[in-house]
Design a protein with these regions (language model features):
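N-terminal type II signal-anchor transmembrane helix
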Residues: 2-57, 478-493
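Short secondary-structure junctions
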Residues: 54-61, 393-395
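Flexible beta-edge/linker motif
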Residues: 67-129, 143-165, 185-197, 308-310
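Alpha-helical membrane-targeting segments
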Residues: 68-74, 101-108, 339-372, 434-436, ...
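Extracellular beta-strand solenoids
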Residues: 112, 117, 122-124, 175, ...
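Outer-membrane beta-barrel proteins
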Residues: 124-127, 271-275, 327-330, 452
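Solvent-exposed beta-strand/coil patches in large extracellular/periplasmic or lumenal scaffold regions
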Residues: 136-170, 174, 181-252, 259-262, ...
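C-terminal or late-domain output modules
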Residues: 415-478
Length: 494
């Protein structure tokens, strides 16, 4: 009897519970349906724009309509959302889809379970330090306001394009056909925003195109994890200049002074692809070129609140190496055999290749293959290249920088000042089997306009070779007793 009564009560309780849940769900659905039928959301567009502008501390306008949808779940869609800061456009998003849990309509604050963007184009403009212009991504000062708490399960990006323009160096990178997502974005509120931000995510881009005529890098992929202001980008992979690149980047914004740690490896890339964006019409018409596979790696750390401070504190190592390269249009060994180091042959022809290691496009953009006269149908085989540098306080010091051909060895000493963008005591020398300098050439000036000193280049020709060889020994001294210019890892050719 008691068992029957208990079972009847349990069955009734279950039916009552299910009826209650069903009624609540029905109320929520009817409420959402009423919103769709009777609520004109576009009338609230000015308030939405004002709320977004206040949250971002930028100017946000919604140029398209706002739409409500019920399935699959309550969603609000915004079309053609434009974000401007200090008069400059920062972003234009074709569509923003906001997924809202139905039960959150009855809470004090509306929550979003997902934000999906489509067709976003983000334009980042960076100016130099101390020029009075604010970067277009920097928000207005907070005054007494603080960032609101953030708890967003997911935000996704489809059809994303990002354009980064450095106004000081006039360089630009464009990331196309990108997609990705960020998950578990959280911030307890307060300032500064980045110091307390946490999330995880992954992104990919079909191509990365620079300003100029070079081939774009492709297949960029990276993951990112942020924990209370520390951002770890790893692994990063990319196809660039015909080679495979990988990198790791850590940015620590949790401290008073931000810090950065970067390591990059680019394996088996083609040096001709790297130098292609740097060539001018005159150098292209000269018919001279260098080609072959090379490897590059660097590991750097820096700290500072500005780009200048980062440069001044940079330290680490850089290395470039390669084998079996070809310098077309120049018979370097044939010319050196006669010591014709004149306007018709300059050590700048190979110094750009040696200096390319630590500075890549930054420094070598001032160099072209310097010899004005091309030798038709000839070339130079470069057997090995090593370019190792130590970076301290923003200055790269040559550690082991040299190359070898069939008959000769060329080496470099000196420093590269990344802070002032200048060459410091760079000397390119032709060295003998003992590492002694047989001829030297000094390079000075800014990175983009290097100046080569021709005053101490030997210019012996034809029948004067023996006489000038004796004069060379008087000036430089015997190779057995000379001051060693190069004692690095590359042996002299046999």
């Amino acid at each position: 009897m008691l068992e029957s009564a208990y079972m009847a009560f349990s069955s009734k309780a279950i039916r009552t519970f299910l009826f209650t849940v069903g009624a609540l769900v029905g109320i929520v659905l009817l409420t959402a349906l009423a919103l769709l039928l009777f609520f004109d959301i576009n009338g609230y567009k000015p308030r939405v724009e004002a709320a977004l502008s206040s949250a971002l501390r930028m100017t946000v306008t919604i140029e398209g309509p706002l739409r409500l949808a019920l399935l699959p779940g309550l969603r609000v869609t915004l079309e053609n959302v434009r974000v401007r800061n200090q008069g400059a456009e920062l972003a234009l998003v074709q569509e923003v889809d906001l997924a809202i849990p139905l039960l959150s309509l009855f809470e004090e604050k509306i929550r979003y379970s997902n934000i999906a963007t489509k067709g976003a184009r983000i334009s980042i403009e960076r100016y130099g330090d101390g020029n009075g212009k604010r970067n277009n991504y920097e928000r207005q000062p907070t005054d007494s306001r603080q960032s609101r708490p953030l708890d967003l399960p997911k935000i996704s990006f489809a059809g994303l394009t990002v354009v980064y323009a450095d106004k000081q160096s006039e360089s630009q990178l464009e990331f196309n056909t990108c997609k990705g997502e960020l998950n578990d974005m959280r911030n307890p509120g307060g300032e500064p925003f980045l110091k307390q931000l946490s999330f995880r995510g992954q992104f990919s881009c079909g191509e990365v195109r620079g300003k100029g005529k070079g081939s774009p890098a492709t297949d960029l992929k990276f993951s990112v994890v942020a924990r209370e202001g520390v951002f770890d980008f790893a692994p990063i992979t990319i196809q660039a200049y015909g080679g495979q690149g990988s990198a790791k980047l850590r940015m620590d914004r949790s401290r008073e002074v931000p810090t950065l740690e970067l390591s990059v490896t680019l394996s088996k890339f083609r040096i001709e692809e790297l130098l292609k964006p740097l060539s001018s019409p005159s150098s292209a018409s000269s018919g001279k070129s260098v080609s072959g596979p090379m490897n590059f790696s660097t590991s750097l750390t820096a700290r500072g609140a500005s780009r200048l401070a980062m440069r001044q504190s940079a330290q680490g190592d850089m290395s470039l190496s390669g084998s079996n390269l070809k310098l077309a249009g120049v018979d370097l060994d044939g010319q050196l055999r006669k010591f014709e180091l004149s306007q018709n042959l300059s050590l700048l022809d190979v110094s750009a290749l040696l200096i390319a290691g630590p500075v890549s496009l930054v420094v070598t953009k001032g160099f072209e293959l310097a010899t004005p006269v091309r030798q038709a149908g000839v070339s130079t085989s470069i057997h090995n290249v090593i370019s190792r540098w130590k970076v301290e306080k923003g200055i790269a010091h040559a550690v082991d920088v040299a190359l070898t051909t069939d008959e000769n060895r060329v080496a470099v000493q000196g420093n590269l000042d990344f802070v002032g963008d200048t060459y410091q005591g760079i000397v390119v020398a032709l060295v003998d089997a003992n590492g002694c300098a047989k001829a030297r050439q000094k390079i000075s000036g800014p990175f983009n306009k290097p100046v080569a000193d021709q005053s101490n280049i030997l210019v012996p020709v034809g029948p004067l070779l023996n006489l000038l060889d004796s004069a060379k020994k008087l000036i430089l001294g015997s190779s057995d007793n000379c001051e060693v210019f190069y004692s690095g890892s590359l042996p002299s050719p046999k």
